Amino acid sequence: MIVAFVVTFILTIAFGFEDEVDEENLLENKKEDKKETAVFSPLKGKVVSLKEVPDEVFASEAMGKGIAIIPSEGKVVSPVNGEVTAIFPTLHAIGITSKTGVEILIHIGLDTVNLNGKYYSSKISVGDSVHVGDELITFDKQAIENEGYNTITPMIITNSINFESIDCIKNNEVNYEDELLIIK
């Protein structure tokens, strides 16, 4: 028996062996690597480039890639299926992580943290499961603007570095739940 083992071992070393490659599984794994995530519009309004946001932190993409929306209404809905991972106490910003791992920050207005939550309301909490179109936050757009604040709303993919590409597929007016970004 030991002789059979030694002979088999020597023949394997001498001639090698080939693993059978399951072409179907190999193809399936490649498809999974190329998985895309659609991110839908969280607001109704006009889409603009982050470079057009009059705030250097957003315009420079220091926090990540994304887009901004000049809202026409005061409601923010979930752009993905996922989980609420952060809500600022002032309700001016919310973080969501999609089921595919895309981390999204929606920042309602510029310098609106200074309003200390005035004009904002929300019925969701950190840890809540959300679906595309679920209402996240409402805000009084007109009152915020009357206080002198810009309501332009950046939507940032904070873990942009983890993705090959983030493409905006809509460049003008958007409605709630319009497909807006494709992330690969």
Q: Regions from the language model: what does each represent?
A:
Residues 3-184:
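Contiguous, well-folded functional domains in the mature portion of proteins
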